[in-house]
């Protein structure tokens, strides 16, 4: 089969994608994922075909330039490009940060670690639970027949299916939420989640670990597509007119949507508030606002009198964000002394997995974005986070979702090339395929047909990176 034949086959698949209801079936057809194959889920070894490594390398080298060329050709301000940059930034951060997880702070060059086997034995370029759960969330959104809403039953089902597939990594809070999950008895259409919700709330309510935040990239992408005009109105009005009415409405809407996802594993109300503030940062980045404008939006929101009328949780977080931003603006602020010094309450290693570390790191890099050279910005930011050790994969993932769209895929630089260069089996390209299909789904579910003409070319590239000459019925 020649390249033209491959392109025609994939074009047929793309044509089928005009109906959003069959997206999940297309995913299962192409990648053989589904509940009928427990143990072969997402990042499992068994999900990939047995490919000759030499042939894979040959195919990879031949097609790598196609993928890079596609990325460089995209319009910087297209929604497709921006959403993809967000998810790709999160996934790349996860894959690279995983090599430094659970390590203590060190100013030494952490790249030496790449020569060793990380704590969870993942391969270079392999994503961990952060990105896998984000993909599960994307599946849940695509499978839900009510396209205008988020359904906790579908989210619980896909998270649970993943949790029972023996993933390489899973946090304690998440694991606890799915200890009683059963493939056989649970089906999302039966609204079964309400039967286990109280038990999860009782067990996990006190958890403020970062697991709820690390998976948000795909949900935020859905929100950007779903509430595009409301987001633009809210941001433009607060930036240009200092009017926060629409921004506050957006904040409450994001809290409501985030709650549907958070209650699956992290039912504490504080997680909804954190998710709202974080989502506003990511949405601002996807909209291609300058970092200082994103900071202005946050400060306008947090300083609004609205929060004095809210509960203690909203008010506390708003005041904390104002305080952190002012701290990070100080030119004498010492990054490593603040985040790396043992014994400090801010030490990333000491309080490993706490959501507040990731939130503060995201704020820090937004405030100081302009101090980095664009060419090496993504690399330098991940360098700094990885050097802190602790829960490095999740911190890099959460920060990466914001930084990705701000710098654009063409500026991922050495990190992007490094991840592509070291893939011995193609778990990472597989996740890129899922990202492409999900972003296309978001377009079609909103009946917005302004999709890039060469998206099929891109999907062909990433699929042939994995399979060489492929058969798609």
Describe these PLM feature segments.
Residues 2-473:
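Structured, active/binding-site neighborhoods that engage oxygen-rich ligands
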């Amino acid at each position: 089969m020649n390249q033209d034949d491959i392109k025609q086959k994939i074009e047929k698949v793309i044509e089928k994608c005009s109906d959003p209801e069959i997206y999940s079936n297309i995913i299962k057809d192409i990648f053989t994922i589904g509940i009928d194959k427990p143990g072969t889920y997402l990042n499992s070894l068994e999900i990939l075909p047995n490919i000759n490594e030499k042939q894979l390398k040959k195919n990879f080298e031949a097609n790598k330039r196609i993928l890079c060329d596609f990325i460089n050709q995209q319009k910087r301000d297209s929604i497709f490009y921006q959403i993809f940059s967000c998810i790709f930034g999160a996934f790349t951060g996860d894959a690279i940060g995983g090599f430094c997880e659970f390590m203590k702070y060190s100013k030494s060059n952490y790249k030496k670690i790449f020569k060793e086997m990380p704590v969870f034995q993942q391969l270079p370029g392999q994503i961990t639970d952060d990105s896998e759960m984000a993909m599960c969330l994307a599946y849940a959104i695509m499978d839900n027949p009510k396209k205008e809403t988020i359904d906790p039953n579908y989210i619980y089902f896909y998270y649970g299916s993943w949790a029972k597939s023996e993933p390489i990594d899973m946090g304690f809070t998440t694991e606890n939420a799915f200890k009683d999950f059963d493939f056989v008895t649970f089906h999302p259409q039966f609204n079964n989640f309400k039967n286990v919700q109280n038990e999860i709330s009782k067990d996990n309510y006190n958890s403020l670990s970062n697991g709820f935040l690390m998976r948000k990239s795909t949900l935020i992408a859905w929100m950007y597509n779903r509430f595009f005009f409301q987001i633009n109105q809210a941001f433009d009005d607060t930036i240009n007119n200092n009017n926060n009415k629409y921004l506050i409405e957006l904040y409450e809407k994001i809290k409501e949507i985030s709650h549907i996802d958070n209650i699956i594993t992290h039912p504490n109300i504080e997680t909804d508030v954190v998710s709202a503030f974080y989502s506003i940062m990511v949405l601002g980045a996807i909209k291609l606002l300058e970092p200082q404008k994103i900071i202005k939006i946050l400060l306008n929101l947090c300083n609004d009198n609205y929060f004095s009328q809210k509960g203690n949780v909203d008010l506390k977080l708003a005041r904390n964000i104002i305080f952190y931003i002012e701290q990070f603006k100080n030119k004498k602020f010492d990054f490593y002394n603040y985040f790396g010094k043992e014994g400090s309450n801010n030490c990333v290693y000491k309080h490993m997995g706490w959501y507040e570390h990731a939130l503060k790191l995201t704020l820090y890099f937004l405030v100081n974005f302009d101090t980095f050279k664009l060419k090496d910005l993504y690399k330098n930011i991940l360098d700094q986070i990885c050097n802190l050790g602790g829960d490095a994969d999740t911190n890099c993932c959460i920060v990466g979702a914001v930084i990705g769209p701000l710098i654009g895929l063409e500026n991922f630089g050495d990190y992007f090339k490094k991840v592509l260069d070291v893939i011995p089996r193609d778990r990472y390209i597989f996740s890129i395929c899922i990202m492409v299909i999900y972003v296309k789904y978001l377009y079609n579910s909103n009946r917005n047909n302004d999709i890039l003409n060469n998206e099929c070319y891109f999907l062909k590239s990433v699929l042939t990176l994995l399979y060489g000459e492929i058969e798609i019925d």
